[in-house]
Design a protein with these regions (language model features):
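Short, Lys/Arg-enriched N-terminal segments with co-localized hydrophobic residues
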Residues: 1-9
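Generic structural motif
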Residues: 19-21, 39-41, 78-80
Length: 96
């Protein structure tokens, strides 16, 4: 079981921004930010979508749109050395 614990610690971290849309484009009238540990960008979005209560679909590259809502998400991989700088840069960032 020690090996399993090591594998869990090695999961990549993803930075996710969730914001409103206007005319189909990201609007940033409001924004929620998350740091998510997951095996892949898709896995990170599954966790974030479950946490925020939306069903989402990938619409290309790093963008995901909420189904039936004017909300979109952007996902990017975070280098482990930069995680603390994200926490310092954004005062309201949730860790999932």
């Amino acid at each position: 079981h020690q090996y399993r614990a090591e594998v869990v610690r090695m999961k990549p971290t993803y930075f996710i921004e969730m914001t409103d849309t206007f005319g189909g484009e990201a609007n940033y009238c409001w924004v929620n930010r998350f740091l998510v540990s997951a095996s892949s960008p898709r896995g990170a979005m599954r966790r974030a979508a479950k946490h925020t209560g939306f069903n989402v679909r990938n619409v290309g590259c790093d963008r995901w749109d909420a189904v039936g809502a004017c909300v979109c998400y952007f996902v990017e991989w975070v280098d482990p050395a930069d995680i603390q700088s994200y926490r310092d840069k954004y005062s309201r960032i949730e860790v999932i």
